[in-house]
Swiss-Prot record:
Domain of life (superkingdom): Bacteria
Top EC group: ligase
NCBIfam families on file: CPSaseIIsmall, PRK12838.1
Pfam family, one: GATase
Name of protein: Carbamoyl phosphate synthase small chain
Lineage, uppermost ranks: Bacteria, Bacillati, Actinomycetota, Actinomycetes, Bifidobacteriales
Entry keyword annotation includes Nucleotide-binding: yes
Main function: Small subunit of the glutamine-dependent carbamoyl phosphate synthetase (CPSase). CPSase catalyzes the formation of carbamoyl phosphate from the ammonia moiety of glutamine, carbonate, and phosphate donated by ATP, constituting the first step of 2 biosynthetic pathways, one leading to arginine and/or urea and the other to pyrimidine nucleotides. The small subunit (glutamine amidotransferase) binds and cleaves glutamine to supply the large subunit with the substrate ammonia.
Catalytic activity reported: hydrogencarbonate + L-glutamine + 2 ATP + H2O = carbamoyl phosphate + L-glutamate + 2 ADP + phosphate + 2 H(+)
Length: 407
């Protein structure tokens, strides 16, 4: 069910056994409960990956977001203990068209439906997700709520809640723009990933301080595979504490929320740049580098979320298929080197190194005069293609060259 042609709210037919999705603009969809029963609200977004739903659910960048899967059939391979990218599910809610009734995979340890229920994730299924996603592409992402079970009942009267009552709950949800969320998802204590693979048991080639703003588990492992000892540190870390780690380079991770609200992290990053440490940032880290250099950031209409986004490396002309999860982007000029705006070009020249071929959104920044670069997407490939794995090699090369120069 949804708005009628006049734009007013249609009266949906639903009962206590249904699940109801209410959008901020009044659209209503009635389906079946999926996962836990209850109420959840957040920003509704869509993800275009055909696979990798466990990695999606456990990506901290999805904090306070209701995720719609555009691929209709979800849950075939069940869930396992190997694929999660963090210690918990972070999505606020989950929407699929046709959940798989059967689990068929040799690694499966349970069903997705049961896992969502066990973790208290309220979901919804059996709605026209294609129609919903087309609406979000047209109107933009917005606040929404999923209601099922007792959440559909007015406790005072015992009657089903009206759409107006449900819509009021949705409109009381904070807007994503203006939210600071990285502290909410960051580790509270430092932990270390030692070199692995061919470097296991050997002295590290490089030491990296990785600031956790919502880091995915695979990311430090990609650096460890290249001989790095990675200290994953809380977002509350000070520059002095970073210096005490004696790192060869500093990394800023992905994460949720509005980069404009990350003032302390931007100031920390400027201290890192001032000290001459090699810097690599991804996703939220790219946005923070942009703001540290003096560029602005802005909210995208519906963002990039999925594992099939085409990105062009403007330095080589090569096109990469990449994994994305971002609703904000850096506002920087494309096609030329410019002076970084902060403090009259204090950080020298910078240029946009990567763009998204779907919409020309900035997907990477490269500093010319200081050892710093970043990308807006996820090179760790969890889930997703491995086209951008070379970026971790580039970071290692940057640390190697910086060490040779005695910095």
């Amino acid at each position: 069910m949804s708005q009628n042609e006049s734009g007013t709210i249609a009266i949906p037919m639903y009962d206590k056994d249904d699940a109801v999705l209410v959008l901020e603009d009044g659209q209503v969809y009635v389906g079946k409960p999926y996962g836990a029963l209850g109420e959840t609200t957040g920003e509704i977004v869509f993800a275009t990956g055909m696979t990798g739903y466990q990695e999606t659910l456990t990506d901290p960048s999805y904090d306070r977001q209701i995720v719609v899967q555009t691929f209709p059939h979800i849950g075939d391979t069940g869930v396992n203990s190997e694929d999660p990218e963090s210690s918990r599910i972070w999505v606020a809610g989950y929407i699929v068209r046709d959940p798989s009734p059967n689990v068929s995979n040799w690694r499966a340890e349970g069903s997705l439906d049961d896992d969502l229920a066990k973790n208290g994730i309220v979901g919804l299924s059996h709605i026209d997700t294609r129609k919903l996603v087309r609406h979000l592409r047209s109107a933009g992402v917005m606040r929404a709520g999923i209601f099922s079970g007792d959440a559909l009942t007015d406790q005072a009267t015992g009657a089903l809640k009206t759409i107006e009552q449900l819509l009021e709950d949705v409109k009381n949800t904070p807007q994503m723009q203006g939210l600071s969320l990285y502290d909410e998802v960051s580790t509270k204590e430092t932990y270390t990933i030692e070199p692995c693979g061919e470097y296991e048991g050997k002295e590290p080639l490089y030491t990296v301080a990785a600031v956790d703003l919502g880091i995915k588990g695979m990311t430090p492992h990609r650096m460890a595979e290249r001989g790095c000892r990675v200290h994953v540190v809380p977002s509350t870390i000070t520059f002095a504490e970073i210096e005490n780690l004696n790192p060869d380079g500093v990394f800023f991770s992905n994460g949720p929320g509005d980069p404009e609200q990350a003032g302390p992290e931007i100031e920390l990053l400027r201290q890192v740049l001032d000290a001459g440490y090699p810097f690599f940032g991804i996703c939220f880290g790219n946005q923070l580098l942009g703001r540290a250099l003096g560029f602005g950031t802005y909210k995208l209409k519906f963002g990039h979320r999925g594992i099939n986004q085409p990105v062009k490396d403007l330095t080589t002309g090569k096109v990469e298929v990449t994994a994305h999860n971002h609703g904000f982007a850096v506002d920087a000029p494309i096609g030329k080197q410019v002076d970084a705006p902060f403090e009259n070009g204090k950080y020298g020249k910078v240029f946009v190194s990567h763009i998204d071929l779907n919409d020309d959104v900035v997907e990477g920044l490269q500093c010319v005069d200081i050892p710093a670069f970043s990308v807006q997407y996820h090179p760790e490939a969890a889930a997703g293609p491995h086209d951008a794995a070379y970026l971790f090699d580039r970071f290692c090369e940057l640390m190697k060259n910086n060490s040779k120069e005695g910095k």
